Amino acid sequence: WIAKQALDLGAYGIVWPHISTVDQARNAVAACRYPRLKGKPLYEPAGIRGDGPTQAVRYWGITLQEYYERADVWPLAPHGEIFVVLMIEDTTGIANLDDMLKNVPGIGAVLIGEGDLSQELGYPRQYEHKAVLDAMAQIVATCKKHNVVVGHPHVEAANAERIIKEGYRYLMCAAPRSFATLEKARGLAGRS
């Protein structure tokens, strides 16, 4: 129900933490979708979001009917403007990621929760440790296989080039470091 509340206030997407199974991934996407009649186009995953987006309509600056037309998950619905991001933060999630991306339409991106992942691997916050980097590389490879954007949560000017070369396309950086990092990453990605 928390996804409904955030979306009803006008959020354009939800980042779902600790997604480790196909069922959890399906539920995450379903929570961001309105129900449809069985057999209708784009039925699966069946939506479970309740109605009531009056704040979202005002925030988005559109009519209620326009909101209903756009309030579906992209890329499942090409016209959809709701973005579903799954956080993979443990080895169970890594093991199940291929099945998630193969069987659950509507996942817009995968974000690696490297803090929790590094904890489970026994190297807390040692983001450059080989075991952590290897686990993250598995996630990147799986996302590339399914052409799903993969995100890195700790981009700095010092690691931006490596991260972009590794295939990350959704880059996050902390506010105090963001301007220099943003400019460097934009240049590396050819977006200056």
Regions from the language model: what does each represent?
Residues 12-24, 110-119, 169-187:
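Glycine-rich phosphate-binding active-site loops on the catalytic face of alpha/beta enzymes
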Residues 1, 9, 13-105, 114:
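Conserved anion-binding
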Residues 31-42, 76-79, 128-151:
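Alpha-helix-loop-beta-strand connector modules within alpha/beta enzyme cores
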Residues 112-133:
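Glycine/Thr-rich beta-alpha phosphate-binding loop at enzyme active sites
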Residues 12-21, 85-89, 127-131, 149-154, ...:
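Catalytic beta/alpha-barrel core
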Residues 154-161:
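Small/polar glycine-rich anion-binding or flexible loop at a beta-alpha turn
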